């Protein structure tokens, strides 16, 4: 079982692989506007994509994010574009099959 589980970190990407299932978490800091997350894993099928924002302590503005790309785009281009309305760090979590 030990040989079936691996993990690694590349730049802002943390990747956990269990057999052919991969969870890739990408931390994207930045300002308001469209951001791009670079995906390191060559997914064959994406099961889930989620965004989690982290705001600065004391921030008064609501945080909102919207994903621009569908799963086919993410697989083909190994990137994900999303919009943020503020200056928060966003974690992108992609779960899929390789």
Regions found by a protein language model. Name each.
Residues 15-98:
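Extracellular attachment/recognition segments
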Residues 1-7, 11:
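A signal for long, low-complexity, Ser/Thr/Asn-enriched, surface-exposed stalk/shaft
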């Amino acid at each position: 079982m030990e040989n079936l589980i691996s993990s690694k970190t590349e730049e802002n990407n943390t990747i956990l692989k269990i057999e052919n299932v991969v969870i890739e978490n990408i931390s994207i800091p930045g300002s308001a506007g469209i951001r791009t997350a670079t995906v390191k894993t060559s997914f064959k099928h994406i099961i889930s994509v989620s965004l989690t924002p982290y705001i600065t302590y004391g921030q008064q503005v609501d945080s909102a994010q919207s994903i621009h790309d569908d799963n086919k785009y993410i697989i083909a281009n190994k990137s994900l574009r999303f919009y943020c309305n503020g200056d928060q760090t966003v974690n992108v979590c992609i779960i899929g099959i390789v």
